[in-house]
Amino acid sequence: FVLLFVLTGCSNQNSQNNQDTLKSKVKEEISYLDNNLISTLNIVNNLSYDNYKVSSKNIQSNKSDNNEKQNNSTEQESQPSGDLSQQGGKAESNSQNSGNSSQTQSIMTMEKNGVLTSRDKKTDWDLLKGLLEALYSSWSTIALDMNGLNINSEDILSFNTFLNDATKSVKDENKKDTMNNLLKLYALLPKYSSSVADDIFTNLLDTKVQVLNAYVLTEDKNWDEINKRLENAINEYGNIINNVEINTRNSAGVSQTYILLKELQRCTSVKDVDIFYINYKNFMQEIQGLE
């Protein structure tokens, strides 16, 4: 009887350890989806947390030589393209034949990547298509892990349904539908989190759901509804402010995030989408650092 009790106890302990390991893994996977979906939503409007980005341009110089053995008989022709006044530049390839030589140079430049300098650019639909297609592969593994836990099966199945909808809207290059369908995907994350993570993690996701709701509503410029969503976000964030654990660990971060959230709400009185995006970007950068 003693041996049976010991074996049963070990089996239960191993089972609990396996469950805890799986929960930890699923929490990391939810964090991945959190970052991935926010980044994808930002790309729709050319928003980035980086104020500068590096880009490159290739320029080609051609030389033709008549091979005559006379002084000053060589004629060179060079035609650069791109702005050489920017930073960087190095030769990447050099090819020659009997009478001609060509040299290709890659010019590296630093470009401003703020809201006001990027918003007039077209949405990179090809990039979005690639990101969503890659998400299918990631989700198949994540869904399998979630099925091993106490997560509602309907909520798990809903992700694939919404992912199909988002992919179709991206394929159709429909901006408004794309943002709404990506938001539906993100809104599932707190439901998953409540089964595997602590209250802090879930409360942060709930707060971001409301802020992303406001972000998506900028397409309609419905400022009254945007303000309501941000009021909901402030109420959700109250759970973070009142949480002793996270305040002990990072009180400065909690306070700064709250200030930026209030500033985001106040800026809606201006009723300017670009100003909203600037404040939205600052808030999202800060709250992502709390996790």
What label would you give each PLM region?
Residues 11-291:
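Mature extracytoplasmic or organellar-lumen-exposed domains after removal of signal/transit peptides
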Residues 1-2:
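Sec-dependent N-terminal signal peptides
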